[in-house]
């Protein structure tokens, strides 16, 4: 049975998801001097705040890693991000502004690809920097075990000895300095940031207070659109989809989806598009707050949704949205590769996305302020001549509509009878200022 190790497994190989930051650097060196055999695995997720990926494995070796590998996860990350977009797998929103589940998508890719690399090296113990209060500890647990059923989990941040010796950033910085690495602790920010090519998450510290707003955040994928001194010119951009896949921006075709998303990030980022402030429910049902960036996905999603609504009928769109919200929750919970998620993904990608071919032109302004300027698709079922108020060849006549309205008498009569019954049993009372009935107040006045 898979176990979570509470103490360092001395003498054994331990894989650590290594970012090169202070926490994982100190943890790796600490594990080495305590007798474990650490292996470092770094995921290249196209993080916008990382300048030199090649240097990270080299630092891991300096800190005591027996081996260090850089795993390029960008293509898989973008593939999963586009799959989520095709399915509308986004369940968190506030007043219509969407969080694009960029961190959960990143965890699905990291959790599977890094553990697969560890398995190749005969490393069956995995550690990472997730804490016991967050979502990632469960996401990584699930994805890791899917790839390697023999996996055991060791997290330094769940090891009391590690916590006692290196429980804070100041202690970690001093530990590294005394070890001769001259590791300088970076300036403390008012919040923490986690990012990948799809988007960035800002949370914790000052952002835990709902009295602190988006204005304390320094965007890393776009501009602070709320600042008066930030000049932003409006810009028209055209996005083209073929069978549900984004293939071109402003007439430029991209064979590499990673390059397309990078350009979409640049375009959307110039306007601060895709930033949102969300209160959400973590997997353990406690509420948390995050401020998110996803300029490229936001741009693609605007165009994709426009085409979906112009191509598919109402019932299909309703099912797409309901399934998307459900799939978004599964993704958030670390269940992106579970059977129920695969079933929902297959439905949307096959029967919704494959019909989405066309292009949409959007005018971007500041933040999430935009207008759709044009929509073109050979698959549109929107045909204005069907409902034109002008004198045109119509698909139905006035007499046809009279017949259709007459048929409505059946359900109108049924509704009237039901309202009478509700009134007779005391559920409804006639409104004093309206011909419509209203709910009868209970004894408490509600």
From Swiss-Prot:
InterPro entries: Arg_succ_synth_type2_subfam, Arginosuc_syn_C, Arginosuc_syn_N, Arginosuc_synth, Arginosuc_synth_CS, Arginosuc_synth_type_1_subfam, AS_cat/multimer_dom_body, AS_multimer_C_tail
Alphabetized PROSITE patterns for the sequence: ARGININOSUCCIN_SYN_1, ARGININOSUCCIN_SYN_2
EC number from the UniProt entry: 6.3.4.5
GO cellular component: cytoplasm
The entry's keywords: Amino-acid biosynthesis, Arginine biosynthesis, ATP-binding, Cytoplasm, Ligase, Nucleotide-binding
Principal location: cytoplasm
GO biological process entries: argininosuccinate metabolic process; L-arginine biosynthetic process; urea cycle
Name assigned to this protein: Argininosuccinate synthase
Organism: Burkholderia thailandensis (strain ATCC 700388 / DSM 13276 / CCUG 48851 / CIP 106301 / E264)
